[in-house]
A protein has these predicted regions:
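Short loop segments and helix-boundary regions at transmembrane helix junctions
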Residues: 1-7, 11, 48-52, 109-110, ...
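Transmembrane alpha-helical segments in multi-pass inner-membrane proteins
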Residues: 82-83, 88-89, 99-164
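Helix-loop-helix hairpins and the membrane-proximal interhelical loops
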Residues: 55, 94, 98-103
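Transmembrane helix-bundle core of multi-pass membrane transporters
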Residues: 1-51, 77, 100-105
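Membrane-interfacial loop-to-helix junctions in multi-pass transporters
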Residues: 29-35, 73-75, 109-114, 157
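Membrane-helix/interface signature in polytopic inner-membrane proteins
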Residues: 43-82
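Residue-level detector of conserved catalytic or cofactor/ligand-binding positions
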Residues: 171-179
Length: 179
């Protein structure tokens, strides 16, 4: 693992913003990582809901062939989407490195299941074209509360993975049921 990060990187993971300027009697703090997540959420909500590119992303997720037939440059939009995913992964990695004060390459190795479950809980479809930034945000919050609760109840990581996998399977069963 790589260690010895600068104070700026540590600030992303451990930094706090003092809120006494709001006139609060007690000293209240807001984590920098929470502020950063809120800023990213607002930017991406605007991007996905108020821009043409955001609408194209939904169209490509729903049916890439129809999107291509309607004149959308699918390959260009996919490059943009994958670039944004890489950028957001980098932000997440910086926050994680700041929290742990180390850059371990396998640190997020088991996070894929949580990410998929958060998206599914938030209403995103396995089949594309559906889902919202707000829904995914809600799914992430629910997953965080679920993980925290399971950790507080001292549930082993194996059974946590089983539970989260079951949530995904149940959502697939629910999606595939005829209406």
């Amino acid at each position: 693992p790589i260690s010895g990060f600068t104070d700026e990187v540590r600030y992303l993971g451990h930094g706090r913003i003092d809120l006494t300027w709001l006139g609060l009697e007690k000293s209240q703090y807001l984590p920098v990582s929470l502020v950063l997540i809120a800023i990213v959420y607002i930017i991406f909500w605007i991007f996905m809901n108020k821009t043409r590119t955001g609408k194209w992303i939904y169209a490509i997720g729903g049916n890439p062939n129809a999107a291509r037939a309607s004149g959308i440059n699918v390959n260009k939009i996919l490059v943009i989407v994958y670039s944004l995913c890489g950028f957001l992964s980098g932000i997440g990695a910086l926050i994680l490195a700041g929290r742990t004060d180390s850059g371990y390459p396998n640190a997020g190795l088991q996070s894929e299941l949580d990410a998929i479950a958060a998206c599914i809980i938030g209403g995103a479809s396995f089949f594309g074209g559906r889902g919202t930034v707000l829904g995914v945000f809600a799914g992430v919050m629910i997953m965080g509360i679920l993980r925290n609760g399971l950790n507080l109840m001292d549930v082993s990581s194996f059974w946590q993975q089983v539970l989260i996998g079951s949530i995904i399977v149940l959502s697939l069963i629910h999606i595939s049921e005829p209406t």
